[in-house]
């Protein structure tokens, strides 16, 4: 889950996030089983949102509510050997504001509702990040410019979450 923060709309609740590219205002909330269970205890039993492999309906509802404090996006990216797929959707002010969009690099990479694109810059996550104002500048794409290429797996991202400072006794 990607969160876009701003000084105008600070988040009400502290979440276990990882800061992304400097000055981007973007943080990543790795959706590990533990984190999902802490924010949506029923998510393990929830069906996925239509079209998505792993976005549980309860997590989508939680994202919708979180978007009252700033933009929220769900990103799913799977690539191996230059081929793969993206799925993305974003919420703003309590409603779906962008997507969902499902893209793949070739036919057969994902289910039939995924559009095949020939330019990686047209993959769903890149398109959504452009909608948020991320510019690729000299990077290969917006995914890399945002700092999302730093880790490949959710657990790698979770290991980057800064531990909470100890509380005074």
Predicted regions and their residues:
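Short, extreme N-terminal segment that most often corresponds to the first beta-strand
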Residues: 1-23, 159-160, 167-169
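Alpha-helix initiation/capping motif
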Residues: 4-6, 30-36, 135, 154
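Short, intrinsically disordered low-complexity segments
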Residues: 15-102, 107-115
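Long, compositionally biased intrinsically disordered terminal regions
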Residues: 98-169
């Amino acid at each position: 889950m990607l969160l876009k923060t701003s000084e105008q709309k600070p988040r009400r609740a502290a979440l276990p996030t990882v800061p992304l590219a400097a000055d981007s205002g973007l943080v990543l909330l790795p959706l590990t089983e533990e984190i999902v269970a802490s924010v949506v205890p029923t998510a393990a039993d929830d069906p996925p949102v239509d079209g998505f492999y792993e976005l549980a309906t309860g997590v989508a509802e939680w994202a919708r509510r979180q978007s009252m404090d700033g933009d929220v996006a769900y990103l799913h990216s799977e690539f191996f050997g230059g081929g793969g797929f993206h799925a993305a959707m974003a919420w703003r002010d309590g409603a779906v504001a962008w997507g969902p969009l499902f893209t793949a690099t070739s036919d057969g990479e994902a289910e039939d509702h995924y559009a095949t694109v020939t330019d990686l810059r047209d993959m769903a996550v890149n398109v959504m990040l452009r909608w948020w104002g991320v510019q690729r500048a000299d990077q290969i794409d917006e995914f890399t410019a945002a700092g999302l290429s730093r880790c490949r797996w959710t657990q790698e991202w979770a290991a980057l979450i800064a531990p909470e400072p100890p509380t005074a006794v």
